[in-house]
Amino acid sequence: MTFSGAEIRDKFISYFRDKRGHLALPSSSLIPDNPTLLLTSAGMVQFVPIFLGQAPAPNPPRAVTVQKCARAGGKDSDIENVGRTARHHTFFEMLGNFSFGDYFKKEIIPWSFELVTKELGLEPEKIYVTIFKGDEQNPADEEAYTIWNKDVGIPAERIFRMSRKDNFWGPPGPTGPCGPCSELYYDRGPDYGCSDDPAKCGIGICECDRYLEIWNLVFMELFKDENGNFSPLAAKNVDTGS
């Protein structure tokens, strides 16, 4: 099953708007209303005031967007990989859905799997996922593991526990909303791998094009202050980017 970029965009929007009751909102400007950012680097940037409780959420409190993004420097920069891989770009459109204190992990995890397998036709057995393994600052995301494993049915050998570098998102600037995340990967097959040895080619091991990250589910529930301390946000939110 093959789709054009426009068809994938339309399917993503229609799934969340028509099937999951989201408000479809336009992309915000590439120039963000945020003094800590040079350019809009993620779909959640326009919603930071809502996540922080400084602005009201839309009605209903869930949204879907296709956000124009640029990454040319800073923490989220992909510029060093542009030209080295087939998947990194400085400018791109990020497909995203957002919950402002509405739904959380037990909803978005099964929805994401349904969208990529039933709506977009990816083979379920080729979907791999990662979760935050925890560290001295924040605990492991056992809730996400249980939902993927028990509710969705992803076997343990296709669920990878990853470090903060890979599976804890944000904030987009030095301070702001953040939280653990769970990423979906698609196995394109051994023809795209860099080695037949699983110890050399795999998620978290190499940067080849076999295992392609297709979606990042961020569980936006914390605020990081200027001293590096974390505190709970007033509501548990969802911020995804594909």
Segments (PLM) and residue ranges:
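Alpha-helical segments
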Residues: 1-242
